[in-house]
Amino acid sequence: MGAVGIAHAQTDYQADADASAGQEMAQTCAACHGQQGISPSGAFPNLAGQQMSYLAKQIMDIRDGNRMVPQMAGQVDDYSDQDAWDVAAHFARQDANLGQTSDEDAELLARGEELYRAGDMSKGIPACSACHTPTGVGIGSAVYPGLSGQHAQYTVSTLQAFASGDRSNSPNNVMGDIASKMSDNDMEAVANYVLGLN
């Protein structure tokens, strides 16, 4: 199937996504991701309000072995593509987390805002907002996730996984290229900034 055929198939699944069916299937997700998709632990991502296309892709990537998440072993192995879209539709319709950052480290937050809004051209790091939007909601049609309100701990671990090559399932591995140019402080800064981006 060519790229046009794949895009058409994804559009069909998205159009047919049944959030009610997804809600039933998502009951097993609650232990880690919370009943409404807001995780009680910073180690696991908030799914509420996330772009449907991004969530469906992640579920299918985990199922197909294109993204390794040990905690998800066996959880989505039997999901059909439609199941993935249904669960994604359920979480996408939930209210996103409204995170708050601490003002304790103003310098760290300022660096995070700088990276998010303008990037760091001296390091070859583009602005995060270029793909994730100025408000951090992401771009569903491009499968770019929303970052607003995401747990800082999870965001840092995700950036570290992209930087190390442990995760490589972003479009054209663009996140691997970007994250590999970021220092630990850069990752911490942008993660804390997006937590409070509303």
Model regions and ranges:
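Sequence context surrounding c-type heme c attachment/ligation sites in exported
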Residues: Q23-Q27, M52, A56, A118-S129, ...
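N-terminal export/targeting leaders of redox proteins
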Residues: M1-D16, M60, D184, L195-N198
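Predominantly soluble domains enriched in secretory-pathway, periplasmic, or organellar proteins
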Residues: Q10-Y13, A96, Q100, R111-A118, ...
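Axial heme c-ligation environment in periplasmic c-type cytochrome domains
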Residues: P40-N46, I62-D105, G140-G146, S164-L197
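The feature marks the first
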Residues: Q10-T11, A15-G65
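The canonical Cys-X-X-Cys-His
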Residues: G22, C29-Q35, V87, I125-P134, ...
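Electrostatic cytochrome c docking/interface patches
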Residues: H8-A26, P40-S41, R93-M121
